[in-house]
Amino acid sequence: MNKETVVVLDFGGQYNQLIARRVRELSVYSEMLPYDTSYEEIVAKKPQAIILTGSPASVHGGEAPGCDPRVFSLGIPVLGICYGMQLMAEQMGGKVQPSSLREYGRAVLQLTGKDEIFKGLPDEMQVWMSHGDTIISLPEGFRITASTANCPVAAISCPQRRLYGVQFHPEVRHSTYGMDIIRNFLFEICGLRGDWDLSDFISEAIEEIKNKVGKKRVLCALSGGVDSSVAATLVHQAVGEQLVCVFVDNGLLRKGEASQVIDTFAKEMKMNLVFVDARERFLAKLAGITEPERKRKIIGEEFIRIFEEEKAKLGEIDYLVQGTIYPDIVESGTSTAQTIKSHHNVGGLPEDMDFQLIEPLRLLFKDEVRLVGEKLGIPAEILWRQPFPGPGLGVRVLEEVSFEKLEILREADAIVRDEIKKAGLEREIWQAFAVLPPVRSVGVMGDARTYAYPIIIRAVISEDAMTAEVARLPWELLDIMARRIVNEVAGVNRVAYDITSKPPGTIEWE
């Protein structure tokens, strides 16, 4: 299929996948490529435009990532964002240096000249900044089009060559007119139509899976969560009875989750489902382990070992399906992005794994996964389940995991989710869950001294898990949760509410 394509060159910045997502929201297909992708490979993609992303690096650093400068001479529009703008300026003859006035967070942008990229926008607007360098000398043919109080060169352009740069991050929602800026770039400057939607993704993914798998059999790691459910359904549409779904109860699931998965997929959706009770096995492997990364890798490796064992029972199976999505890949790090945490769907897999992977959702964000699921006819009660980490409660029981701690957390978590549902907030809250820290505190219950665990409630609002704001739950709701937890869950005498956004925190504690 010939479709409009925007290539996003990834330099490792925190928000880079959001850029690709914003472009897709405007019905234009975007594809992320590593910053060092060859000029020939970029040309082979036949892009209508190129976007250069942000980066944690500095353009004047010794190992600054760069792209082939010939991309600026392709004759197609290029938009540089943050580091991308500085790189464009540096590679085309300008100069960048560290700034004495760094900018992190909200800033007020003032337009200093007319430009197509700001068409129809006010002269003053809020933007989101994250930079420590600044352009001090422009390349020939460029002009300054916007500034802030601390950044005299906040946007540049060379309209004759259709080269544009912004120092801020239009892809982040905190930039009030960010989507309008991206829209202007795509439609006013690039002249695109917007000819891509998720129906195209589904048909292409199904065709790709068919071609890859052929007549071979496929094993799906089914958790019952949104991602694995959509991945399983997509693969099932591609290969039908060649797919075998394996559901592993690792003892790290939420209350009632195992029975719900069996009822939904085996009984209602009629999928070929193999159930494995591995609760004791996982707990034995996790005994004495306190470091989060080790827990994640142990859980990921044990999952694979179980699937390999099931493969041996089932006969010849060559492929393993996983519900890996874009944020999993981002947080696991790229060559230029720092690793925040490894995901068992990505960095936690053993090197000697006896499968080839199929990850049909690896280019999608959570909201896109749900839209695909709707198009595939998956029930809403599955699609709107809150995200649940692959390692499950194993990374919500902080430090060492034990049966006792898991039971405490399972009950507390069920109360949190129950009250969110009763309050009608299920679709407003991205995630709401309980965390069990490895400390105990003194309390008093029934005139007696207690020494028990606290429970931390975590609730956030997000669109894509890349950034998240703390959910401002009603005080009355928090009070109900706290009273229920301390009264109904043995071993708990205190409840706290986590009010940290992402960044600086991650959504999960481990």
From Swiss-Prot:
Q: Which residues form the GMPS ATP-PPase domain?
A: 196-385
Q: What does the record give as its pathway?
A: Purine metabolism; GMP biosynthesis; GMP from XMP (L-Gln route): step 1/1
Q: Which residues form the Glutamine amidotransferase type-1 domain?
A: 5-195
Active site, UniProt feature: C82 (nucleophile), H169, E171
EC number(s) given by UniProt: 6.3.5.2
Class of the enzyme per the UniProt entry, highest EC level: ligase
Q: Which NCBIfam families match?
A: guaA_Cterm (TIGR00884), guaA_Nterm (TIGR00888), PRK00074.1 (NF000848)
- Name of this protein: GMP synthase [glutamine-hydrolyzing]
Species this chain originates from: Syntrophomonas wolfei subsp. wolfei (strain DSM 2245B / Goettingen)
Organism lineage reads as:
Bacteria, Bacillati, Bacillota, Clostridia, Eubacteriales
